[in-house]
Amino acid sequence: MGRMWLETDQDRRPFTFIRARFSDGDGSATSKYLPRNHLPLPAQAWLDRGIKQGHVGTGEMQFHGRLRDIRALNREMAGEFFVDFSIDRAEVFFAPGWQPASNGSGRVLFHNVSMDIDLDRVSYDQIDNGRARVTIADFENPSLDLRIEAGSSTALAVSTWLETPVGKQYRRVMSNLGSFDGAVSTEVNLSMPLRGPDPEPDVRVLVNFENASARSESWGLDLSQVNGGMEVTADGIRARKIAARYFNDPIEIDIDTPGRGANTRVSARGRIETRQLLNKLPSSLTRDLDGKSDWRLRLDIAGLSTPPDKPLLRLNATSNLRNTAIGIPLPFAKPAPAALQVTADVDFFEEQIWFNSKVGDSIRTRGQLVADDERDFTLNLLDVAFASELKSKTRRRLNIYGSIAEISIDDWLQYLEDSGAADPDLLGSVEL
């Protein structure tokens, strides 16, 4: 149903006005009602597959201007062409590798050589109640711009992100995390030229955590009350000053990926209970640590270019151990106010964890935790060297060796007995 009006000027150049209303249409047939001869082929291809399905409720088409090429009318501002309609149950495709948005409800507007799809309700993968906007500003030089805003639980956000092209590289690492809680709000911005055979989208995802949390039993990690924002692109992740709690201690987190395929570095700092950083060791070896110290943590997450025989995660931790009392006999013992510089490096593999540490100037440690069939890690070896270097050869169980000026054998025997470290299953050798 509509109206049409046609007139000519004194030079017999036609000027027309067309207005039509329509309803109960097929949203996937959108491009059939547009001036296809004036659209570049990549733009036509996207329109043919972009709106994959949908029900058109009501709409209107209007044209007024000279009967000329719409692109010329647009450049000369000598006429206008509109197609405006409501749509529901829409499914909109964006780019290869990305899931289409589904169950969309909103409006579609074509104005001269531009397009605007505004969906005030849309689902993306498992996330519902999102909002999306898709625009092509100029069909003569077409580029697709997309923005999706959505909120969901942390668990849904993580599982959805890992299925996207910008999240797949983190699947191995994230498979070790679970018990997700809290909420996440997300804004996906995608821009893709609609020219050339294989256009690559430029993606920028803004993520805001709202009291999110995650745990890793195998790695001894417990993060809670995570609040703050980060940016995810095809090149990696960036974030500044994310607030969180490591177990119950407040920390601040920065994240940076220097380039595509490179390791992602997570830096954290805070006053942390020292014993918690060693929670994967037998409690008999950590029970005499008491207090919280300022720690700086640097965590490198394996990137796409990391060889498979390298660790998934590499942790470096440093502290002066002020405010942590050590009840282990000399030369480890120290009161809480005293300083003792400690540096530790920990490598996380799928089935094992290796660690090395330097305590003060003359103590070195090395250890290995191995996973059983239930993915529980237990101590396989621990070397404690009172020396500037560790022996190259490793032996199972607890091995103490090196040179020390003074040591109380009675104190150590009593400590080993009280802690259970003297158990034959744990104690391997003592060479002092």
State each model region's role.
Residues M1-D118, V122-Y124, D128-F355, Q368-L432:
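Membrane-proximal interfacial segments on either side of biological membranes
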